[in-house]
Regions:
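Cofactor-pocket helix-loop regions in the catalytic cores of large enzyme subunits
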Residues: 1-329
Length: 329
């Protein structure tokens, strides 16, 4: 929930000025790193916008539960169904959208990439392909068998997603973006990836998306704000000899800290947020914080001053330092 300004200042201070190569976010790029890498390698933004979802006549939800974890996007998808938009759900787990779908593929014996390959063969067999693929119609039985599902299941699913003019694919972590992009080309679909928490896309653009390794760290600085810190992350931080934590609420993490800095909540701070659509939005504080509580940006500026460091306000330029998975605006 930290604004872009804070993420930029955090990156400047600890990576660029103090030389740490172990700077990231709580999610460690889990939702964004593969897509960011694919965009960099291909040299282009490959995702569409939420506006594409509004006009979709078929939707593929791939490996994500929009009801449980991404309610806003889930609402956009669900409200289209009464008007005739078709829904295909592919997930190895139980998915709360499945009861609303026209077809659900739950292949627990294989990867989502394998399922897309079998589905591609079914699309080719039905003559619904709009783009090229190396998969052939004759591959269907073998590919379907590999996933533990019958060929007929894939033929049904192929008709749901490919017999339409404006298909949209919604996907999350756990599948290779290049595989999704290839499948999208086959059926002429737009792609939207679900990017996790607020400002995850901004963190990715600032390269704050790498896995953390705290095993040899002697000190750690955590700016939690009012975010909830996982038990796994708390356990990792607790092992570090010296811990500084800025947080809005008491938690096991603050209890283990050597230094605790009181923090404002997201309602008590100004700043910018980059949504999954690539749209930059400005938030204004709704509540005046207590005098003793600094925002994360103010705390970082104070720490930087103590080191004799002047932080630059160039976060907008930094957001465009690499190709994003979705066009920024």
């Amino acid at each position: 929930r930290l604004p872009v300004e804070t993420l930029s200042a955090f990156n400047q201070l600890f990576r660029k000025e103090l030389g740490s190569n172990n700077v990231s976010t709580f999610e460690e790029g889990e939702f964004t790193r593969p897509s960011a890498r694919f965009a960099t390698e291909s040299g282009r933004s490959f995702e569409g916008k939420l506006d594409d979802l509004k006009t979709a006549d078929s939707i593929l939800v791939l490996g994500t539960d929009l009801v449980r974890h991404h309610e806003v996007v889930g609402f956009f998808a669900k409200r289209l169904l009464p008007s005739g938009t078709k829904l295909l759900v592919i997930d190895q787990k139980e998915n709360d959208l499945a009861p609303l779908s026209n077809k659900t593929l739950r292949a627990t014996k294989s990867s989502d990439e394998d399922v897309l390959s079998a589905l591609s063969a079914a699309i080719v067999k039905l003559g619904l392909a709009k783009g090229k693929t190396a998969v052939k119609a004759g591959d269907l039985d073998g590919l379907a068998s590999k996933t533990g599902l019958e060929s007929e299941e894939y033929l049904d699913a192929a008709y749901v997603i490919a017999a339409s003019e404006k298909p949209v694919i919604l996907f999350e972590k756990g599948i290779t973006p290049s595989a999704v992009a290839d499948f999208a080309t086959l059926i002429g679909a737009r792609i939207i990836s679900i990017k996790g928490g607020a400002n995850n896309l901004a963190a990715s653009q600032l390269k704050l998306d790498q896995p953390l390794n705290l095993k040899t760290s002697k000190a750690v600085v955590v700016f939690a704000g009012d975010d909830e810190v996982s038990q796994k992350m708390t356990n990792e931080v607790e092992k570090v000899p010296f811990k500084v934590v800025q947080a809005a609420y008491a938690s096991p993490l603050t209890a283990a800290a050597d230094v605790v800095l009181p923090s404002t909540t997201w309602l008590e701070q100004d700043g910018h947020y980059l949504n999954l659509d690539g749209h930059l939005q400005e938030a204004h504080r709704a509540i005046t914080p207590a005098e003793e509580c600094m925002s994360a940006s103010e705390a970082l500026a104070a720490i930087a001053t103590g080191f004799g460091i002047a932080l630059e306000d160039n976060w907008e330029k930094e957001l465009h330092q690499q190709v994003a998975s979705v066009e920024l605006n």
